[in-house]
Each structure stands twice: as structure tokens, then as C-alpha cells.
């Protein structure tokens, strides 16, 4: 992040706040003609022999700072916090707002307009259905660049998404499970196209029963989200129950409901839980409390 200096009326100067060890770069998708702001945080400590764990973070404009500072603080004492240092790669957009409407395009599967849930404000949904192209950007453009510039442990890759981002995480898990080893889906918008998710879940369960595949999955929601007509919590819990039966095949799944938290307020506590889930010194851990 570039530091900026501004003159003050009292003769002093004001410097823009910068998180140590971070940078922002622009990247274009070769196949989709789209441009993203990539927020990167690198640990101050040398990489372990296998390389740094990495977390690919969706909606970086809203939560990159939260996750980066949490890793910086907790990663100093892994033996106490259960969090080791990691590279954080946030995927964001050219906007000063926490969220961009482009997330609807990038995080969702193709769905007929008549099958979409009603939008809270009554308007039509923005462009949507581009999840496959977004996944190709991550796999074909972003990951190779990150692995070129940083020492990455390819056996400890996590993807984190919330809301529609959580929906995208589930799509990747159920259709491209080899892409990551740990999947964090917070308040996932399963209601966007629940039949699609359930169909893909059945297929995933069937394949996994035949081929053991160690994967770590954290599903979570805020307690207060249960009152929304989307049934966010029930849907996430139902998916967890379908996946939990695969424990003998190497699937380690957990569902967390955070007391007193809503759809947005859940983010900081979800980040903290996700870090202990994905970055424990001994590998991803369940029920970290």
C-alpha cells in the first residue's frame, strides 16, 4: 500500500495508514477481461521449510484488514493462540465501498431469473452467473502469480467467503474439491440456488465415499440470521449434516452458530474462528471454541 502525505492546517502532516507487510496489485483475468484488486499480506517471519500456509479471501475490500491484523497479532504466539503465520491473498474490486456489485457476477452459478430469490430491496439482481470464470481466474492467473512471488505450502491452501462468497466457496468444494484443502463458508447464501447445491452435494458425497479425500470444512452463521426468510442457518446446518457422515473418508466438517451475531456482525468472530480452524500449528482443527 502506498503511503500518502497531506498538509494540515496547523502546519503538520497526515500520513495514510498502512498495514505493515501488505501490498495491493492490479490483476486482469486473461479469459474474462475483468480486473481485480489483489490485497496481499506477508508474514514478517521466514517461511517454514514447506512454505507459508495461504488463505484466499473473497470480498477483500470489506474484511482484508480484519483478517490481516488478526493473523499478525495471533501469529506471534502460535503455541498460545493456535494460529501460525500465513500469507493472506484478498480478492477485491476497484471501489472505496466494502462491497462491489461485481461479487454477484463472480460468486454465483448460472440461475434462471425466475428461480432467483427475491431481492431485499425489490430490485432486479445485478449481473450474475459468472462463478466458473472467476474460479478460472483464481486457478489459472492468481495462484500461479502468488506461488511465483511467495513460498507457499500447496498442502495448506484455504479459501474463505461470506454470504455470496460463502456460496462460491461451497461451489468450489462440491465441484473442484482438489483446489483447496480447507473451505470456510460463512453465512453461505445457499438459498440463491439450493437445488443446485443439494444436487452437487449428493454427487460429492457419492464420489468421496469411493475415494478418500482429506478436506476441512467450516460452515458458520450468526444466531440472529436464523430469523431471515432465507433460512441461512438451517441451510448451512443441513449441508453440514450431509457432509459430516464422511468423517471416515477424511472429511472434517464443523458447523458454528455465533450467539448474538447477525449477518454482518458475525464477520470478526468468524474470522477469528476461521484462523484457528485453518492455521493451527498441527493442521486444521475442529471445535476450537
Swiss-Prot record:
Keywords on record: Cytoplasm, Hydrolase, Serine esterase
GO CC annotation: cytoplasm
Keyword Ribonucleoprotein in record: no
EC number: 3.1.-.-
Subcellular location: Cytoplasm
Protein family according to the UniProt entry: Belongs to the esterase D family.
Name by which UniProt lists this protein: Ferri-bacillibactin esterase BesA
Designated gene of the protein: besA
Amino acid at each position: 500500500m502506498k503511503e500518502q502525505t497531506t498538509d494540515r492546517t496547523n502546519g503538520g502532516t497526515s500520513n495514510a495508514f498502512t498495514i505493515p507487510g501488505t501490498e495491493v496489485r492490479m490483476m486482469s483475468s486473461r479469459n474474462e477481461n475483468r480486473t481485480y484488486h489483489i490485497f496481499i499480506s506477508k508474514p514478517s517471519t521466514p517461511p517454514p521449510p514447506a512454505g507459508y500456509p495461504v488463505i484466499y479471501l473473497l470480498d477483500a475490500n470489506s474484511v482484508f484488514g480484519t483478517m490481516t491484523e488478526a493473523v499478525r497479532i495471533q501469529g506471534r504466539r502460535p503455541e498460545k493462540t493456535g494460529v501460525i503465520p500465513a500469507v493472506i491473498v484478498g480478492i477485491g474490486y476497484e471501489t472505496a465501498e466494502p462491497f462491489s456489485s461485481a461479487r454477484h457476477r463472480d460468486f454465483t452459478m448460472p440461475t434462471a431469473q425466475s428461480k432467483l430469490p427475491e431481492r431485499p430491496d425489490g430490485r432486479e439482481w445485478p449481473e450474475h452467473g459468472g462463478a466458473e470464470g472467476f474460479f478460472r481466474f483464481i486457478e489459472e492467473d492468481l495462484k500461479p502469480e502468488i506461488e511465483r512471488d511467495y513460498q507457499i505450502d500447496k498442502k495448506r491452501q484455504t479459501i474463505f467467503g461470506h454470504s455470496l462468497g460463502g456460496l462460491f466457496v461451497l461451489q468450489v468444494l462440491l465441484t473442484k474439491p482438489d483446489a483447496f484443502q480447507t473451505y470456510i463458508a460463512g453465512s453461505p447464501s445457499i438459498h440463491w440456488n439450493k437445488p443446485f447445491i443439494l444436487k452437487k452435494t449428493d454427487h460429492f458425497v457419492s464420489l468421496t465415499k469411493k475415494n478418500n479425500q482429506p478436506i476441512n470444512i467450516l460452515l458458520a452463521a450468526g444466531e440472529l440470521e436464523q430469523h431471515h426468510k432465507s433460512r441461512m442457518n438451517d441451510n448451512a446446518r443441513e449441508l453440514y449434516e450431509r457432509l459430516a457422515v464422511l468423517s471416515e473418508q477424511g472429511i472434517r466438517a464443523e458447523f458454528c452458530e455465533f450467539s448474538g451475531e447477525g449477518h454482518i456482525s458475525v464477520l470478526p468472530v468468524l474470522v477469528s474462528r476461521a484462523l484457528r480452524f485453518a492455521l493451527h500449528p498441527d493442521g486444521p482443527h475442529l471445535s476450537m471454541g
